[in-house]
């Protein structure tokens, strides 16, 4: 993500007029997971009515990705928000609901998180649809229910989703079973786009160490000593390509 794209995304977040109320539960029992750059908590949201009708808008559960306060994590969060906005809606990609600056919740006492340390710096909040579990969790707890037809259906859905991403010049960069969510009817949804790469990025990625998870990482990412970013003349590392996702998908399956 270039500096201009980063500034544009930050301005979009701060200038949004989403008319959405959010309740964020930072208690440990509501923690859904965590990663290198963020923690995910259960939340609830509803959007304000845009007309004068008396229809009641109910609260809906959501997953709130609370990005760590350090610069690297905030940049990864902005990159994920940018990627999800750019890709748009897809049946097998987690749905982006909104992106907020946590300062907005602090400034509005009616929306303030119920648990919040006063010395904790504000974070970027990525509000996503809430799904029951990850593929990893389901396979561990329902071993007898995961038969070959179900696994083949998941494989087809994942392959079609990766193909769709690649047709739009997007490399997910961190495909693994923990980043695959399941709906109530056991359809898959790919999540965690914080490592995403775009083939036409204005600022190519040259750091292989920050891409992917070691157990699912393509072997060429471990052989980088013969390549110098200084000699690349603005080009991305040759290993950072669509083949990364193909290898990771093969490991997952």
Predicted region positions:
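Activation segment signature within eukaryotic-like protein kinase domains
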Residues: 154-155
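Short beta-strand micro-motifs within the conserved protein kinase catalytic domain, predominantly
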Residues: 95-122
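Catalytic-loop of the protein kinase fold
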Residues: 166-183
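The N-lobe alphaC helix and its flanking beta3-alphaC-beta4 segment of protein kinase-like domains
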Residues: 67-91, 97
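Activation segment/activation loop of eukaryotic-type protein kinase catalytic domains
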Residues: 183-219, 223-227
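Conserved short submotifs of the Hanks-type protein kinase catalytic core
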Residues: 119-134
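Juxta-kinase regulatory segment immediately upstream of eukaryotic protein kinase catalytic domains
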Residues: 1-23, 27-30
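ATP-binding glycine-rich loop module of kinase domains
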Residues: 43-75
């Amino acid at each position: 993500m270039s500096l201009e794209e980063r500034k544009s995304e930050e301005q979009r977040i701060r200038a949004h007029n989403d008319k959405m109320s959010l309740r964020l539960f930072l208690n440990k029992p509501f923690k859904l997971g965590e990663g290198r750059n963020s923690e995910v908590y259960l939340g609830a949201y509803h959007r304000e009515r845009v007309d004068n009708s008396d229809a009641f808008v109910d609260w809906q559960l959501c997953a709130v990705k609370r990005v760590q306060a350090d610069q690297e994590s905030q940049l990864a969060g902005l990159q994920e928000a940018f990627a999800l906005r750019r890709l748009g809606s897809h049946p097998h990609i987690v749905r982006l609901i909104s992106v907020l600056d946590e300062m907005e919740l602090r400034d509005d006492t009616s929306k303030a998180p119920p648990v919040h340390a006063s010395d904790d710096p504000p974070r970027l909040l990525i509000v996503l649809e809430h799904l029951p579990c990850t593929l990893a969790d389901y396979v561990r707890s329902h071993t007898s229910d995961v038969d070959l037809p179900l696994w083949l259906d998941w494989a087809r859905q994942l392959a079609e989703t990766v193909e769709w991403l690649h047709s739009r010049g997007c490399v997910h960069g961190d495909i693994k079973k923990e980043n695959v969510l399941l709906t109530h009817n056991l359809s898959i949804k790919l999540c965690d786009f914080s490592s995403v790469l775009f083939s036409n990025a204005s600022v190519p990625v040259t750091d292989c160490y920050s891409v992917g998870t070691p157990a699912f990482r393509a072997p060429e990412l471990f052989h980088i000593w013969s390549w110098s970013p200084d000699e690349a003349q603005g080009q991305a590392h040759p290993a950072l390509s669509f083949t990364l996702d193909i290898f990771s998908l093969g490991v997952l399956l």
